[in-house]
């Protein structure tokens, strides 16, 4: 491989390594955001309800608890995905290269073995080594970005669930089912609306799970 191509590969490796550092920084921000949303929701959502928890109607309390629990669980999944994105990529390359610290340990039993390989390496094979390194770094980078994308989607779903945990109880409260003269009609209307919201929420989760399965393939 000629000198120009080797220099191009070196620049590409530096660029990929820079993206890896940026991905880790982005993951830290996502983790902070997800943790902040979870803490805020756990401590303050009940304060936004029309009544205290012990005075809420059964329907309001159940809807609040349901969406709150769903939101917390999905938020935790988002945190788990973010932690996976932060985790160091320690998979060795399919083809050994002398630059990756993972490959150095994986393919060499001692420093002497590694030293001998360095001595035998000539410039003509340097490009192959850099290509192997850049490919392995790119695989790790893509894996981090995929986990970040999934974490963001899960975080959005959890925030939507937290929002519904406030909106639905207020909805029940405003209609005041227990006092209205058209109780059966309102109950039926609320049941239909709640069912639609639940179906939309469930479909969102199913689509996301299908997306994960397709992504893994």
From Swiss-Prot:
Q: Which Gene Ontology cellular component annotation is one that this UniProt entry carries?
A: plasma membrane
What is the top-level taxon of the source organism?
Bacteria
Q: Name one GO biological process term.
A: defense response to virus
Q: Name one GO molecular function term.
A: nucleotide binding
Q: Which UniProt keywords apply?
A: Antiviral defense, Cell inner membrane, Cell membrane, Membrane, Nucleotide-binding, Transmembrane, Transmembrane helix
Q: In what way does this protein cross or attach to the membrane?
A: Multi-pass membrane protein
Q: What is its main location?
A: membrane
TM annotation in the entry: 29-49, 60-80, 152-172, 187-207
Q: Tell me the compartments it is located in.
A: Cell inner membrane
Signal sequence region = none
What is the stated purpose of this protein? Pycsar (pyrimidine cyclase system for antiphage resistance) provides immunity against bacteriophage. The pyrimidine cyclase (PycC) synthesizes cyclic nucleotides in response to infection; these serve as specific second messenger signals. The signals activate the adjacent effector, leading to bacterial cell death and abortive phage infection. A clade E Pycsar system. The effector component of a two-gene Pycsar system. Expression of this and adjacent cytidylate cyclase Ec303145PycC (AC P0DV26) confers resistance to bacteriophage P1, T5, lambda-vir and phi27. Probably only responds to cCMP (produced by its cognate NTP cyclase), acts by impairing membrane integrity.
Q: Could you tell me what this protein is called?
A: Pycsar effector protein Ec303145PycTM
The source organism is: Escherichia coli
* Protein's gene: pycTM
């Amino acid at each position: 491989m000629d000198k120009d191509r080797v220099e191009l590969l070196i620049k590409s490796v530096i660029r990929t390594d820079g993206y890896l550092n940026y991905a880790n920084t982005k993951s830290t921000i996502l983790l902070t955001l997800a943790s902040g949303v979870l803490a805020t929701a756990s401590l303050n959502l009940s304060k936004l309800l029309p009544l205290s928890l012990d005075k809420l109607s059964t329907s309001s309390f159940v809807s609040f608890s349901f969406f709150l629990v769903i939101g917390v669980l999905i938020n935790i999944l988002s945190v788990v995905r973010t932690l996976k994105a932060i985790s160091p990529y320690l998979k060795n390359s399919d083809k050994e290269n002398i630059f990756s610290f993972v490959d150095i340990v994986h393919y060499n039993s001692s420093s002497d073995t590694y030293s001998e390989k360095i001595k035998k390496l000539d410039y003509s094979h340097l490009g192959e080594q850099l290509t192997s390194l850049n490919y392995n770094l790119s695989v790790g980078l893509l894996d981090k970005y995929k986990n970040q994308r999934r974490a963001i989607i899960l975080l959005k779903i959890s925030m939507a669930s937290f929002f519904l945990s406030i909106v639905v109880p207020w909805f029940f409260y405003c209609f005041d089912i227990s006092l209205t003269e058209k109780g059966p009609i309102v109950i039926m209307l609320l049941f239909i609306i709640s069912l639609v919201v639940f179906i939309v929420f469930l479909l969102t989760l199913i689509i996301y799970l299908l997306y994960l399965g397709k992504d893994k393939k």
